[in-house]
Amino acid sequence: MNLDGVFVESDDEKAALASAHGNRSLEAKGSYNTLDFVVRLRPDLHKVLEAQGGEISMRECDFWDVAQAFSTYLHETIHWWQHVGTSAGLMLSFLQPAHAHMNRKWLDDVLATHGPVKPLLRLSEKLSDAEQPDGALNLVLNNWHDLDFFQKLVINPVGLVKRVAEHPYFESVGHSYRMAIGAASWLIGATVDPNYEALPHPRDWEADMEALRESKAEGFYFGSPIEIPPLGLLEILEGQARFSQIQYLYGASGGYLSWDDFRKRGMLDGVYVCAFETFLDFAEEGWPATVDDPIVGLFLLICDVALSPSEGLFLPMTDPSSLIWSTDPGWRFIFLCRLAKEEGRGFKRSIQTYSAEEYWEVSQRLSDLLLSPSPRQFAEAVSRYAETHPAWIQLMEEDRTFEYREGNFPIRVLLGRFTRVQRDKLTAPQFFCWPGMCLTSYRQALDSETVRSLFSEHQALFLDRADRDVYPRLVPGKDEKTLQRLLDDFYIWVSMYEMTRQWLVEDGPFDYDYGWLTSKFSGAEIKDWADNAFKVGTGVHPDAFSVLR
């Protein structure tokens, strides 16, 4: 079972295994999956929240079960923000679509040469055994593996580096990271900036990458030693979500709950605390006395900055030799922790009021020391593109109405949401960095009206309900038919991406397990739906495929 890209909220690490894509027996309290873009809650938590009449008092909860249920929803909503509101998460969200979009021409060539056969990985092995290599097929599979290596090294470097390093398709860390940035850039460019009039072009630093390979710079050539950070994106994302959740519960209790209370509830174990403990180690700090201690605020800010690499994607790549360290969230996190330590104890205690001013000041200082564009520079650049570039202006109008053009549909949806986060972050960065402190009145990090407006705007687009089916989130002022059409159109594309993945690398016939999406249609109806989407995308019906053994 592949759990890459599954992010869960659980008091039991074993329960997380039940929340993988396609498994309807959800035991964890909640989950968010990079492949299906759905925020899920356990049915009993849905019932608790639904009993509030759809209106959750985020600032004052009279009952612990309501506060706890909402905190789980907040935890999973933060995973949505991480994936559509940060550059690291956006790249992760774009990996599966990239296989279908960027390989389109070469997949057509493979179909023309070999006909409809699956999986292409098995076809490549047979051609290799017969010493009949196919250039287009090799490009498709090289692209697949490069992006897969990036995902593995970024999410779980410690657990997966050996598997990646020993894979026959693996060239180098730098190459995989370059391909991932290029794939995301290509999707964004094709959607809003096809001539790269605003965005930096990946080819601008192509020659530098070749020079690094030829000079055998570490990390950029075949056979190079691989240095990995002690943690990956998984630990950072779960740590950020869990400690924000804990701060919310702390504030909702009026500051009554202690660390021991959260430990007794199983909220400070395993993957959920790994990033925080790593931060304390590298920053040379002891465990803070209270949940709202400045050290906790600094940890969450470092998570935020670590998830915001921008060079090569939205801003020019200034030093290609630092590509790995400037892109990888795990390395960024470690370097930021070290820099915070070097700045001294006074700096580490800068977050006193959890204000926008503190966020900008501390994030700018750390970014300057990291020699990296700051979150403000990043957000300003994206906002500038969205305000001055005609195609991006059009996209933001689509995002406002939730009525999107057909081409690159999921890319338009995700990029529109990403841009909206960056715009709103310029006015209220503390909401996205310290949501737990903003969602209660305990520390009053942000006024109530602004908090409600921002939380309403940035909840996930797609949620499950107690029956486990997926529904569009109801948005005030938006027609329900428009929102349902958004969901329908979005998941037509998602099904095509999944079928393309199976075509490339999955043994056996096509699998039509879409029970994670809906239980309201028969297996035959679901198959027809997925088959039609795939045929529109590829020109070939799945039933025409021969399965290689």
Place the predicted regions along the sequence by residue.
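Non-catalytic terminal regions of proteins
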Residues: 1-98, 181-200, 257-549
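Short, compositionally biased low-complexity segments
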Residues: 41-50, 208-217, 244-252
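Short linear interaction motifs
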Residues: 51-63, 209-227
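Post-HExxH zinc-binding segment in Zn-dependent metallohydrolases
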Residues: 84-157, 235-253
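Long, low-complexity, polar/charged, intrinsically disordered or flexibly structured peripheral segments
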Residues: 149-223
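Active-site cradle of extracellular carbohydrate-active enzymes
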Residues: 187-194, 198, 229, 233, ...
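Cytosolic/matrix-facing juxtamembrane and C-terminal tails of multi-pass cellular membrane proteins
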Residues: 217-219, 229, 252, 256, ...
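Active-site metal-coordination segments of metallo-dependent hydrolases
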Residues: 227-240, 262-273
